[in-house]
Design a protein with these regions (language model features):
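Structural recognition of the beta-strand scaffold that forms the well-ordered cores
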Residues: 48-53, 83-86, 102-108, 129, ...
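Extracellular ligand-binding/catalytic regions of CAZymes and related secreted enzymes
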Residues: 19-44, 71-74, 78, 224-226, ...
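Catalytic beta-strand/loop cores that center a nucleophilic Ser/Cys/Thr
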Residues: 27-37, 161-250
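A glycine-rich, often tryptophan-bearing local segment used as a flexible ligand/cofactor-contacting loop or short
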Residues: 111-188
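Extracellular/periplasmic catalytic domains that process cell-envelope and extracellular macromolecules
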Residues: 42-46, 77, 96-100, 128-131, ...
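Sec/Tat signal peptide C-region and signal peptidase I cleavage site
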Residues: 14-18
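Bacterial N-terminal signal peptides
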Residues: 4-13
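Helical hinge/lid and interdomain linker segments adjacent to catalytic or ligand-binding clefts
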Residues: 20, 25, 57-137, 141-144
Length: 320
């Protein structure tokens, strides 16, 4: 017993020292306070939005799906009459979480390991889409094998096709913004991330301008030396779309956002607002003229992180 007490004290002190050294005053890995799969009251007068975080991925500070989804949940709570419900590890434990959702959001690893394509889940999501439910994929979640992308493209208007799309890290200088509810309150910004581009667009169109129903939301000019696929190299000097909205023929809405690799980018107000606005728009919630409220304390970048087997390093906004 004495040995167990000593070990407990040792590990407790080690954790405390790590917290104190970072100057946080809290355990950055404590995820226990994040409410999971909490359903709204039966008399909810508003929209339920389901956010699904992927499992642990990449190194510290990157692909922080749990922490990033928790950030989004807290941001969405700042909009009246919205009830965000968060699930973890790629899929809800209780699939009834999806019942009555106005929008579903997936922030997770994609392609062959995409949680959405396992078993009969695509069919279950198709049933939601048939009801006009909104569809949002963030970062790696926009990446599908072509056999699955052929379905998802009809929900989102475009997807990352591993045969032709590309995923470099570069500084996206977002200058021109279209007039759209998603861009309300969003100012031009420049931010480094793993911005995917050269998407596979609905209708098998090579250019987003030809993709019916798709509105480019964020566009920037990538360095030509980032065009790592033969298809991407066909379009040297082309401004590329890194986030887009889709008005589905059935009246539903979709949104794809290729950023979100670097967790620190949630500290950027315009980065946050464009994603929150998009989720609200896909849920058919009126986006305020000045954009959604997205108040955020940068110290919260260090909350709810996944433990990834490396010493803790404080996450700060870019340039800090």
């Amino acid at each position: 017993m004495r040995t167990l007490l000593l070990l407990a004290a040792l590990f407790g002190c080690t954790s405390a020292r790590a917290d104190d050294a970072a100057g946080l005053g809290f355990d950055p890995y404590d995820q226990s306070k994040v409410p999971l799969e909490v359903q709204p009251p039966p008399d909810l007068k508003g929209q339920k939005i389901v956010l699904v975080a992927g499992s642990k991925s990449h190194g510290p500070g990157d692909h922080e799906f749990f922490a990033g989804t928790a950030v989004l949940m807290n941001l969405l709570k700042q909009t009246p009459n919205v009830w965000p419900v968060m699930a973890r590890d790629g899929w809800p434990k209780d699939e009834s979480v999806f019942d009555g959702a106005a929008c579903v959001v997936f922030y997770m690893d994609g392609r062959g390991g995409h949680p959405v394509v396992k078993g009969d889940r695509l069919k279950k999501m198709q049933a939601l889409m048939d009801k006009g439910v909104g569809w949002v994929n963030l970062h790696y979640a926009v990446d599908y094998e072509p056999k699955d992308g052929a379905t998802v493209v009809n929900w989102m208007g475009g997807y990352y096709d591993p045969r032709t799309s590309i995923n470099p890290h570069w500084d996206a200088d977002i200058r021109a913004l279209p007039k759209h509810p998603i861009t309300r309150g969003v100012k031009p910004f420049n931010i480094r991330d793993e911005w995917y581009y050269n998407m596979h667009w609905v209708g098998d169109k090579p250019d987003v301008a030809e993709a019916k129903g798709v509105t480019p939301i964020l566009q920037a000019l990538p360095p030509d030396n980032t065009r790592g696929t033969a298809d991407a190299k066909k379009y040297l000097g082309r401004i590329e779309t890194v986030a887009w909205a889709y008005d589905r023929p059935d009246g539903g809405r979709g949104f794809g956002f290729t950023g979100g690799h670097s967790h620190r980018n949630w500290a950027d107000e315009d980065f946050r607002r464009v994603v929150v606005n998009a989720i609200l728009w896909c849920a058919k919630v009126d986006v305020p003229e000045g954009g959604a409220k997205v108040a955020f304390d940068p110290v919260d970048l260090n909350r709810n992180l996944d433990q990834k087997g490396k010493p803790f390093q404080k996450i700060a906004p870019a340039g800090k």
